Amino acid sequence: MNYTPNIQKSSQTFVSVLQKAKDWFAPLSKTEQQNLIDDLEHGAAHLTNTRQLNAYIAKYGEIHQAKLLHAYEKIPSKVWHEDGITVVDYGCGQGIAEMVLSDYMASRYIDNDYIKDFILIEPSRQNLQRCVKYVNAFFCESQISVVCKKDNQ
């Protein structure tokens, strides 16, 4: 008898979000692409508009994904056998870490509803709004608390 686990997961994946960003970025003129890349300040800029948000994922998404997957592999397996966890993400950006976490959990047959809540902290209101949108899409059962806070606050 075959057993198919009933895994609650998002129909979205980070790979699909990344591909949409790349598809948006690719047809831009070389000048537009370079201007956006310059605006990103090597990934350290305070992003203020949708174009910058899209460019950031297109430019840096794969790098973040690789680092995050490596880190998630280091999570002790006993963590996944507890009563659920809270994720605190200081400098959450657009929620790349949360999206990659969802993909990682799905690859390990761990229900997304295992994450009870998220505390998202980010200085950029635009980033934070997009992060909340993605966390809601990827973790529909989780509670979300947000803090829009600058480094000096």
Language-model features: where?
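Conserved SAM-binding loop of SAM-dependent methyltransferases across substrates and taxa
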Residues: Q94-D111
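Conserved SAM/SAH-binding beta-strand->alpha-helix loop
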Residues: S124
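Conserved class I S-adenosyl-L-methionine
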Residues: D83-G93
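N-terminal auxiliary segments of SAM/dcSAM-dependent transferases
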Residues: M1-L40
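Class I SAM-dependent methyltransferase Rossmann-like catalytic core
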Residues: A45-K78
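S-adenosyl-L-methionine
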Residues: Q129-Q153
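Short beta-strand element of Class I
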Residues: K116-I119
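Active-site catalytic pocket residues across diverse enzymes, especially alpha/beta-hydrolases
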Residues: I75, V79, M105-Y109, V135, ...
